[in-house]
Amino acid sequence: MNLRPSHPHPARRGPRIAVLGSYGGFNIGDEAILTCVLSCLRARRPGAHLVVLSRNAEHTRAHHPDADEVVPWEGVSRNHVLDVLPGLDLLVLGGGGILYDGEARRYLRLVRAAQTRQVPTFAYAVGAGPLTDAEDRDAVRTVLAEMDDVVVRDEESRLVLEEVGLEREVAVTADPALLLAPEPFTEAMMRDEGIPSGARLVGMSVREPGRAAEKLDEGDYHALLADVADFLVRRLDARVVFLPMERHDVRHAHAVLSHMTAPDQGRILHGDYSPGQVLGFMRHLDVAVGMRLHFVIFAALTGVPVLPLPYSGKVFDFARRLGAPALVGVAREQAGLLLAEVDRLWDEYPQRRDGLRTRMGELCASAQETCERCGSLLDEIGAARGSGGAPAPDEGPSGDGPYRAEPRPLHA
């Protein structure tokens, strides 16, 4: 098996740091997180040898040139993965929502193996919950108690860890993807997607109903979101663009389109785009309505008025911190309330824009705190071992601080 990175780097003499998470191209949000974690580590330790433990090594090699080495950890022998641990100076767990039923124990098994080999471990703005399975709860309680530092991305996750019985300090910061830098999404790319120049655009993110619409069958759920899309088409004289954040979202986007009375006014992005390009695309939008957390984050980063449709605690928590309106859930009989909230979002945004921009600055600064805590731990590790590479100057992961775009002007 070829374990060489796609982008060979000169030998590095800094610390050897491994990053473990749900990486490998399955979800744009997770890929955005990995981009930001690697950028942080490279900014703090330019000479570090960065290893990514990936669920799809080929994808990670191709899309993350900051990684010096990529090692698969699914579908390979346990010994193959354990061979990565000797010589590590730090194992970074996360970020992202990886501590939940059925998955937590899989990640923490490797963290525990690192701990038994005296490798320092750091939880990088992870998300937790739901955690009801006894084996997962025990793994979270025991393994996180022995980590060198535990940082979660929201208050909901801290409360989940507290309920599980974790008795230690847990820092709350914000999602690492808040520090993502945009990449251009050009007019030529817009044409390739069949999106007309100069049109008002509404971005939508849909996924399986989950707890956001637990009383709806799938057909009613799709019909409700189609009502929202049709309303925005009429209200704003706009086109609707669906942004799949992972591949299963495409099916739900097609289903919503099929329920619309004006399906010709809807498009689904079909290209294979990097997280930075998706963030760049958001700058073309006039308003955004969606369920996926990182869709909501990207919209907020670009100053687009956004209505989160929460399906889990992480979206509720982000909407609360952003000060954005957020519905408890969606039900067919509440369609009128949902449409009224969308209408109010559009009308009131000019008055709310400055407050949202201030809150986003605070959230970006909070996300930066995770990077600083990781850098401090690397300082301690280097001091204890008498090396570890020189720290970089104090700067954001991309070298120029968090991205804060001016919003696209609202059309009259």
Where are the predicted features?
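Active-site anion-handling motifs in enzyme catalytic cores
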Residues: 1-412
